[in-house]
Regions:
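Substrate-binding cleft of carbohydrate-active enzyme catalytic domains
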Residues: 1-161
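Short Asp/Glu-rich motifs
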Residues: 56-58, 172-173, 220-221
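Flexible, acidic glycine-rich loops studded with aromatic residues
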Residues: 162-167, 175-185, 192-264
């Protein structure tokens, strides 16, 4: 589900009324049962916990976690968490610890897409962090955030997946380049309207998973299955780098489904 809310039950989060959820949520016990049910059928469930964007459920309770103390909708997307506040990383590490305790999957998906950076630009704290790290762009600052989460997951013996927005910080292969996403992060390609993304992903050393919004998002009732079955993602990857292709994913977003029958 791509709505900015948590649908699991983190034990340490103090909920604030009904501002964070709609439509209910899964308890940890329910999720453990779901993981076991899937495992018995040789299916591994990989959780996605979005950050630093799509986090309105967090900022509704902890507005101090944003760069400006603002917990609202921005110009296009929700206001993201601040990459310059240590308490944000501490909080997210607690969340990820609980997620990893429930989901034994090798991979953890952290989102990292659709991050509106206006509040970062307004924040003296964010600008100071950029100066200290030698970054020239706010995309590099996003990569810094993602890399810190990536390193934490690796310390815990897990691998990280993120959306392709996270590659915009720079190229680690450029001498002296700063702000690049760690090459050991797996990247899901979804921004089909941005030219050259798949090739850039693999040229920066990442494994890639194809799930371009067109045609791989099946939320649209008019989406033709023919285009999914005949999608040729390998045509976008140089022959010498095709070993970095993990595979593909057809994406169905739960909030766009009104009932199970429509999902089926």
């Amino acid at each position: 589900k791509d709505q900015p809310e948590f649908e699991l039950d983190p034990r340490f989060i103090v909920r604030n009324g009904d501002r964070t959820l709609y439509g209910g949520y899964y308890t940890q016990e329910e999720l453990r049962s779901l993981v076991a049910y899937a495992r018995e059928r040789h299916v591994e469930i990989i959780p996605e916990i979005d950050m630093p964007g799509h986090t309105q459920a967090i900022s509704a309770i902890y507005p101090q976690f944003t760069a400006t103390g603002e917990a609202s909708w921005g110009t296009i997307f929700s206001v993201p968490l601040s990459p310059a506040k240590e308490e944000v990383y501490t909080f997210l590490q607690h969340v990820l610890d609980e997620v990893m305790d429930i989901f034994p999957s090798r991979y953890i998906h952290i989102g990292a897409d659709e991050v509106e950076k206006n509040t970062w630009r307004e924040s003296a704290e964010c600008r100071q962090l950029m100066d200290r790290l030698g970054f020239k762009t706010y995309e590099a600052l996003q990569s810094h955030f993602v890399n810190r989460i990536h390193d934490y997951l690796q310390q815990k013996g897990r691998e990280m997946i993120c959306w392709d927005d996270a590659i915009e910080g720079g190229d680690y292969q450029v001498p002296g380049g700063k702000g690049a996403l760690s090459p050991s992060a797996d990247v899901m390609y979804w921004r089909y309207w941005v030219g050259g993304v798949p090739q850039r992903v693999v040229e920066q050393g990442h494994h890639i998973i194809f799930t371009p919004g067109d045609p791989m998002y099946v939320a649209r009732p008019d989406g033709p299955l023919y285009d999914i079955y005949h999608y040729q993602g390998l045509d976008l990857i140089p022959d010498s780098l095709q070993h970095l292709v993990r595979g593909g994913q057809v994406s169905l977003w739960g909030e766009s489904m009104s009932n199970f029958r429509r999902a089926d």
